[in-house]
UniProtKB/Swiss-Prot annotation:
Keywords: Cell projection, Cilium, Cilium biogenesis/degradation, Cytoplasm, Cytoskeleton, Exocytosis, GTP-binding, Nucleotide-binding, Protein transport, Transport. It holds the Pfam family Ras. InterPro entries: P-loop_NTPase, RSG1, Small_GTPase. It is found in: Cytoplasm, Cytoskeleton, Cilium basal body. It comes from Xenopus laevis (African clawed frog). Belongs to the small GTPase superfamily. Rab family. Signal peptide: none annotated. Interacts with fuz. GO terms for biological process: cilium assembly; exocytosis; neural tube closure; protein localization; protein transport; regulation of exocytosis; regulation of vesicle fusion. GTP binds at residues 58-65, 171-174. This is Ciliogenesis and planar polarity effector 2. Residues 46-249 are annotated as: Small GTPase-like. The gene is cplane2. GO terms for molecular function: GTP binding; GTPase activity.
Length: 249
């Protein structure tokens, strides 16, 4: 049975949607926002802001930092470096709820921490989970063990009674010649665990004509499926909590 989206999937391609998207760009490059910054909107572009804390976890080397860099418009690191302590990154993503004339700008605050810090300091995991709206469990398409470890990773990270949205993300989709995880594997996983699975490439997108800076618009288009998917899941959850739409049967 098909489910009607709670967010308009075509709005971002409209002139109005493109105007809102331009507010997270500067000279066709991505703007970067600090913890207390937000896009500046002119009076003719009203919008509400919906803030969400998202904890990104996974075994060392699956590409957590690269995943966040990709979504936020930063350059994907060329070499792996363990994240020291906790790192937070804010990004904004405009959407429009179905049946509404007023857009909503999602404020995603991604929390990332290194596996070594998690093992060494007992306070790291509780801090990352505190008031989190979603936990993203990452695996790499080039590392089958990271995929097979996802159920155990979920159990280690969350108790069964913790009411947090769970999403699985497959990274390094670009390295399809070296993939160790098949589409059949993903279908079996989704059928067994009833969790959404998304896919992301772990390489930089096109660059500007100067050859140095990343093309912001191209980067937004590349990340749109994951950002829209995450926004849809979280907005639907909030609508269910508010009693505005029905939950899953």
């Amino acid at each position: 049975m098909s489910v009607t989206p709670v967010l308009d999937p075509e709005w971002q391609r409209s002139p109005e949607g493109l105007d809102y998207l331009s507010r997270v760009l500067r000279h066709n490059k991505r703007k970067f926002f600090g913890l207390i910054e937000r896009p500046v909107l002119p009076p003719h572009l009203p919008a509400d802001v919906a803030a969400y804390k998202v904890f990104v976890c996974g075994k060392s080397g699956v590409g957590k930092t690269s995943f966040i860099a990709k979504l936020s418009g930063l350059a994907v690191p060329s070499m792996h470096h363990e994240t020291a302590g906790i790192q937070t990154t804010c990004m904004y993503w405009p959407v429009r709820p179905s049946g509404s004339a007023r857009p909503v700008i999602f404020r995603f605050q991604f929390w990332d921490c290194g596996e070594g810090a998690l093992r060494k300091f007992d306070h790291i995991l509780p801090a990352c989970k505190e008031k989190a709206d979603a936990v993203l469990f990452l695996f790499s398409f080039t590392d089958r063990s990271s995929f097979e470890d996802v159920p155990a990773l979920i159990s280690r990270t969350l108790d069964q009674d913790e009411d947090v949205t769970r999403v699985v993300i497959g990274t390094k989709l670009d390295q399809y010649m070296h993939t160790d995880v098949t589409e059949d594997d993903l279908r079996d996983f989704q059928r067994t665990w009833q969790l959404p699975v998304m896919r992301v490439r772990s390489v930089n997108g096109p660059r500007m004509t100067d050859g140095r800076d990343l093309d912001g618009r191209a980067g937004l288009a590349e990340c749109a499926p994951v950002l829209n998917g995450l926004a849809e899941i979280l907005w639907h959850r909030d609508q269910v909590i508010a009693g505005l739409v029905g939950g899953a049967e």
